[in-house]
Amino acid sequence: MEWPKRARTADWENGVLTLDTEKRLEAPELTAEMMERLAGYALVGFHVKGYPITDELLSPFAGHKRMVNFGVEDGALTDACFPVFSHMPKLRYLLLDGNADIRGSGLPALQNCKIDLLTLNRTGLDDAGLLCAASLPRLFHIQLDHTSVTYEGLLATAGNARIEPVAHVQ
């Protein structure tokens, strides 16, 4: 597998790692070494869909200076993943759909982040986790379809005029 010298985006799905939407590398799994190599690039976007990424595999990305858009969908992340994102000064979009073990208790780690959009669809997010999300000062949109958030939980965040929770009737 030949890696390019530079990359701005990385996307892994179905065993294929795509760098900058054009360089395709066969990668049936994402190893710790691959994650370290990817974290070495000046990426602005990183997305993985359908691979059991763990909190530990994310650690090389801690403090990534240019990351704007980060997504792990249908992975194996927990609330312990949030400190990794807390030191990404340009992070605006955090997509964590389908990580069932995320409850929201780790969200206070993002208190100083500039995240505009947080997607937590199909996670274990509950009312307490939603309150943690609502306390993030720069968060404007949160998606929470197919979570444990109740109507009462939504009402508890109603006083926060800045945040716009998005949930569809289920």
Name each model feature, range by range:
Residues P4-R8, W12-E36, Y41-Q170:
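Concave beta-strand-loop units of leucine-rich repeat
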